[in-house]
Amino acid sequence: MQKVTFKEETYQLEGKALKVGDKAPDVKLVNGDLQEVNLLKQGVRFQVVSALPSLTGSVCLLQAKHFNEQAGKLPSVSFSVISMDLPFSQGQICGAEGIKDLRILSDFRYKAFGENYGVLLGKGSLQGLLARSVFVLDDKGVVIYKEIVQNILEEPNYEALLKVLK
């Protein structure tokens, strides 16, 4: 099992770890209208799925803003940001920060994303939140890029991700 750190704590990641080449599972998440939606989207060249612990964190907000900016530049790519925040909180934060060009989804109801993508934080002060991670899926829903950020306080490798999307 993979591990990540936050300050002095080390977390075991729970759930089924996906590898590059695996078919990505389609899971139910909750949107800003409290409606259940499927993660996987049809008819897009690439799908970037970005998970983070909480949009209230400064690094998490930077990550969401970065992907919002990229979403405006790459119309053939679908961007989703997923956290365990309640959809109401997600909406308030994104509205205040001008984040509007990507899908903001919550895994709070079923934890299905965290468990099926292997990014649910295990025992510790952040238990039950999502590890900072990025998955890129191709048009068939196959994982072609995966990054789990080892230190939760750091941002993903945006340059490596953008190379995959070119």
Curated annotation (Swiss-Prot):
It comes from Helicobacter pylori (strain J99 / ATCC 700824) (Campylobacter pylori J99). Thiol-specific peroxidase that catalyzes the reduction of hydrogen peroxide and organic hydroperoxides to water and alcohols, respectively. Plays a role in cell protection against oxidative stress by detoxifying peroxides. Homodimer. This is Thiol peroxidase. Belongs to the peroxiredoxin family. Tpx subfamily. The lineage of its organism: Bacteria, Pseudomonadati, Campylobacterota, Epsilonproteobacteria, Campylobacterales. One of its GO terms (molecular function) is thioredoxin peroxidase activity. Disulfide bonds join C60-C94. Residues 18-166 form the Thioredoxin domain.
